[in-house]
């Protein structure tokens, strides 16, 4: 999806949130970190990614359109926090104590590692697998690893190895 397909109001709301949280961080940290590059090129089930070396945030336009309010409130600060942590502390654990501190103490946003958005529209082909207690859907990548004998996956609930249906 090209940026031009995203309504301008949503793009403006994203920029407003990014600038608001960046200004808040700069004030609290006593720094003058620059505005990162922003693109809408993230694909798949990831809501966004922070590219440290290029100081860029890539957002998933499909998930943004489907979950605008929650996405703007949570994902934009989440990715910004990664860039700010990298600038402030250098290379550290992606969701470590520095990131949690940046999210909660500096940006004032709950530190959640994953989103809870519905993924049906962005999920690629999946393969059904079973265990004792339920059916699972494995991604193409995980399925291929099983087929090649490179990986074994287990159910987090019952611990049984997953087998193809």
From Swiss-Prot:
Q: Which domain of life is it from?
A: Bacteria
- Which processes are annotated in GO (biological process)? response to stress
Primary location recorded for the protein, binned into one broad class: cytoplasm
Active site annotation, chain numbering: 79
Pfam families, per database record: SprT-like, Zn_ribbon_SprT
Query: MF terms per GO, please?
Result: zinc ion binding
Q: What cofactor requirement does the entry state?
A: Zn(2+)
Which residues make up the binding site for Zn(2+)? 78, 82
Q: Which UniProt keywords apply?
A: Cytoplasm, Metal-binding, Zinc
Positions of the SprT-like domain? 22-163
Determine if Cytoplasm is one of this entry's keywords: yes
Give the similarity note.
Belongs to the SprT family.
- Which HAMAP family has this protein been placed in? SprT (MF_00746)
PANTHER family in UniProt? PROTEIN SPRT
Q: What is the official name of this protein in its record? A: Protein SprT
């Amino acid at each position: 999806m090209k940026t031009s397909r995203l309504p301008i109001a949503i793009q403006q709301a994203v920029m407003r949130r990014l600038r608001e949280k960046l200004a808040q961080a700069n004030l609290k940290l006593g720094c003058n970190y620059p505005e990162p590059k922003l693109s809408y090129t993230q694909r798949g089930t990831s809501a966004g990614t922070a590219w440290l070396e290029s100081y860029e945030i890539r957002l998933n336009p499909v998930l943004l359109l489907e979950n605008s309010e929650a996405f703007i409130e949570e994902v934009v600060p989440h990715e910004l926090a990664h860039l700010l942590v990298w600038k402030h502390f250098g290379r550290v654990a992606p969701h470590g104590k520095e990131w949690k501190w940046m999210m909660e103490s500096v940006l004032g946003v709950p530190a959640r590692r994953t989103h809870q958005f519905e993924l049906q529209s962005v999920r690629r082909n999946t393969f059904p697998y079973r265990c004792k207690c339920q059916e699972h859907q494995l991604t193409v990548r995980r399925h291929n690893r099983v087929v090649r004998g490179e990986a074994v996956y287990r159910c987090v609930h019952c611990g049984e190895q997953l087998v193809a249906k």
